[in-house]
């Protein structure tokens, strides 16, 4: 079975209990999360061999995160122990019409301070068939962006399949900064994943007559987006998620997919969510 490596940040997740607001909370439930870490965990639970590449502080907090990663059967042999701190995020679960709220405390985290030429990519990728990254890691810092590019180039040179979830985060960077960084990375990507906002903010590609902030989804409009992405960046496969928010706990979800120019529209599913964060 193919082995997948992901590169990114693991954060300690501090969630309010019983859907309390952050301002009400007297204590928080601690766990761990992160876009690329979540992918590694999910794949591992499906029986896919995985490796997670990150940087953790060399202290008890970093040890706790490392043990958590290992607990899911994920290969941790390429994790660096460096830097001063593990990033945090505070989570306020949504209720009814009140959306979930996330507050980040991740500045100067270990992964943000990672430098090029510190990971031996030939060794890290020696048993890897697929490399996955997201737009979150290069948004953390200039050096994290440089390491992401370094990893992506190495994977491509080694004949490894490369996938990218664009995952635009407005709290981390502007569309202008995102495009300046993400467009060069796309040269090495075989498979792209995202939604309509990701395509517009990260790559400057938008659906005709579609407002990405309206919440109204028109699958036909995204055929043009898929064609533009294929033409401009040469992706072999592209997946765009289509999500309609009904409430904090109920969404309609579908997807549109391009496989070498052949476009497929998925069925729409009504989903009652147990935990929205990390659900894509």
Which sequence ranges carry the predicted segments?
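Hydrophobic faces of well-ordered beta-strands that scaffold small-molecule active sites
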Residues: 52, 162-164, 192
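Conserved N-terminal subdomain of the carbohydrate kinase-like
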Residues: 49-136
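Beta-barrel outer-membrane channel/assembly domains of diderm bacteria
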Residues: 13-16, 38-45
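Positively charged, low-complexity intrinsically disordered leader regions
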Residues: 1-21
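Conserved phosphate/ATP/ADP-binding segment of small-molecule kinases
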Residues: 172-261
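Short catalytic helix/loop segments, enriched in acidic residues and glycine
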Residues: 21-40
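Short glycine/threonine-rich catalytic loop with a Thr-x-Gly-x-Asp
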Residues: 29-32, 247, 269-280
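A short helix->loop->beta-strand "cap" motif at the edges of active sites that frequently abuts
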Residues: 154-161, 233-236
């Amino acid at each position: 079975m193919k082995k997948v490596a992901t590169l990114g940040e693991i954060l300690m997740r501090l969630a309010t209990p019983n859907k309390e607001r952050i301002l009400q909370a007297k204590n928080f439930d601690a766990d761990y999360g992160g876009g690329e870490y979540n992918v590694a965990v999910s794949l591992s639970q499906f029986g896919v061999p995985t490796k997670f590449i990150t940087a953790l502080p060399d202290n008890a907090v970093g040890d706790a995160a490392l043990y958590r990663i290992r607990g899911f059967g994920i290969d941790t042999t390429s994790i660096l122990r460096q830097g001063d701190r593990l990033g945090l995020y505070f989570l306020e679960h949504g209720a009814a019409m009140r959306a979930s709220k996330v507050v980040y405390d991740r500045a100067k985290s270990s992964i943000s301070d990672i430098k090029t030429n510190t990971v031996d990519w030939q060794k890290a990728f020696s048993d890897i068939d697929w490399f996955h990254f997201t737009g979150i890691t290069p948004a953390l810092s200039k050096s994290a962006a440089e390491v992401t590019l370094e990893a992506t180039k190495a994977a491509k040179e080694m004949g490894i399949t490369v996938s990218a979830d664009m995952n635009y985060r407005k709290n981390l960077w502007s569309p202008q900064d995102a495009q300046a960084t993400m467009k060069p990375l796309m040269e090495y990507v075989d498979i792209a994943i995202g939604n309509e906002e990701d395509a517009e903010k990260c790559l400057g590609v938008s659906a005709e007559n579609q407002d990405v902030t309206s919440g109204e989804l028109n699958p036909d409009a995204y055929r043009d987006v898929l064609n533009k992405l294929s033409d401009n960046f040469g992706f072999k496969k592209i997946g765009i998620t289509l999500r309609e928010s009904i409430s904090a706990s109920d969404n309609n979800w579908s997807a549109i997919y391009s496989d070498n120019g052949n476009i497929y529209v998925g069925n729409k599913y009504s989903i009652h969510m147990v935990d929205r964060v990390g659900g894509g």
